Amino acid sequence: MQPAGISHSLFPSLPPEFLPLALYTLAASILIGVLLLAAWWLGAKTTNRNKELPYESGAIPTGSARLAYPVPFYLIAIFFIVFDVEAAFIFAWATAWRELGLQGLVHITFFIVILLLGLVWLWLKGGLDWGPSRARRGHVRD
């Protein structure tokens, strides 16, 4: 029999399902630390020029491997990430549309309208133009 106020759990306010998760997280963190330490300890300490060269099917590299990507590439990548995350929200809504009813339909319609307004604004600002601008192509009317 236990005296009043003493609990079996180390953290009585946490649910009992927390202990396996905490132990798993601790074990994974220790394993990662051990593997990183072993890689550092067992890894090669010396470097030379031949070890740092990229290996491409036995071909000797010529020139620099660094390529300058145009800035619009990064803009398109960021726009893709933003719209991809928003698509994830739409897919989540689509899986629960029966439970959400009319209120969910109104909310997702509002969400999609905001997305479309953002896309139109982006298009009008020239964020989706990849090539030369219209002013440089001579298509601007006076």
UniProtKB/Swiss-Prot annotation:
Keywords on this record?
Cell inner membrane, Cell membrane, Membrane, NAD, Quinone, Translocase, Transmembrane, Transmembrane helix, Transport, Ubiquinone
TM spans (from-to): 18-38, 73-93, 104-124
Q: Name one GO molecular function term.
A: NADH:ubiquinone reductase (non-electrogenic) activity
Q: Give the EC number(s) listed in the UniProt record.
A: 7.1.1.-
Q: Which GO terms describe its cellular component?
A: plasma membrane; respiratory chain complex I
Q: What membrane topology is given?
A: Multi-pass membrane protein
Q: What class of enzyme is it?
A: translocase
Report which reactions are catalysed by this protein.
a quinone + NADH + 5 H(+)(in) = a quinol + NAD(+) + 4 H(+)(out)
- Compartment(s): Cell inner membrane
Its function, per the record, reads: NDH-1 shuttles electrons from NADH, via FMN and iron-sulfur (Fe-S) centers, to quinones in the respiratory chain. The immediate electron acceptor for the enzyme in this species is believed to be ubiquinone. Couples the redox reaction to proton translocation (for every two electrons transferred, four hydrogen ions are translocated across the cytoplasmic membrane), and thus conserves the redox energy in a proton gradient.
Recorded family membership: Belongs to the complex I subunit 3 family.
HAMAP family reported for this sequence: NDH1_NuoA
How would you summarize the oligomeric state and partners of this protein? Answer: NDH-1 is composed of 14 different subunits. Subunits NuoA, H, J, K, L, M, N constitute the membrane sector of the complex.
Name under which the protein is recorded: NADH-quinone oxidoreductase subunit A 2
